[in-house]
């Protein structure tokens, strides 16, 4: 599990991205790069790093499910992910 501070930082960053998304879009459309540079750096969506929504793990993230491979395997074995079955051929 990731440190609580890293998870809190991620939530804060996501809030900033959401807050400034519209303003950032307007400034980009106008081509006002000086105005863009005055916005907080963490308000850019590019700076977000995908993390497991359950335990905050930053590596081995599966975009389709929003979780790490470890949590995915754990929940899939319990049958808690709809539509996921163990492969057999």
Curated annotation (Swiss-Prot):
Coiled coil start-end: none
Pfam families, per the entry: Ribosomal_S14
Record-annotated disulphide pairs: none
Function statement: Binds 16S rRNA, required for the assembly of 30S particles and may also be responsible for determining the conformation of the 16S rRNA at the A site.
Record-given protein name: Small ribosomal subunit protein uS14A
UniProt keyword terms in alphabetical order: Ribonucleoprotein, Ribosomal protein, RNA-binding, rRNA-binding
Gene3D superfamilies, A to Z: 30s Ribosomal Protein S14, Chain N
Family the entry assigns: Belongs to the universal ribosomal protein uS14 family.
SUPFAM superfamilies, sorted: Glucocorticoid receptor-like (DNA-binding domain)
GO molecular function: rRNA binding; structural constituent of ribosome
GO biological process, one term: translation
A GO CC annotation given for this chain: small ribosomal subunit
UniProt subunit comment: Part of the 30S ribosomal subunit. Contacts proteins S3 and S10.
């Amino acid at each position: 599990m990731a440190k609580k501070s890293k998870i809190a930082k991620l939530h804060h960053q996501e809030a900033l991205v959401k807050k400034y998304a519209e303003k950032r879009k307007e400034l980009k459309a106008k081509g006002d790069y000086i105005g863009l540079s005055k916005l907080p750096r963490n308000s850019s969506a590019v700076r977000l790093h995908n993390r497991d929504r359950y335990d905050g793990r930053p590596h081995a993230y599966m975009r389709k499910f929003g979780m790490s491979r470890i949590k995915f395997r754990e929940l899939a074995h319990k049958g808690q992910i709809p539509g996921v079955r163990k492969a057999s051929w």
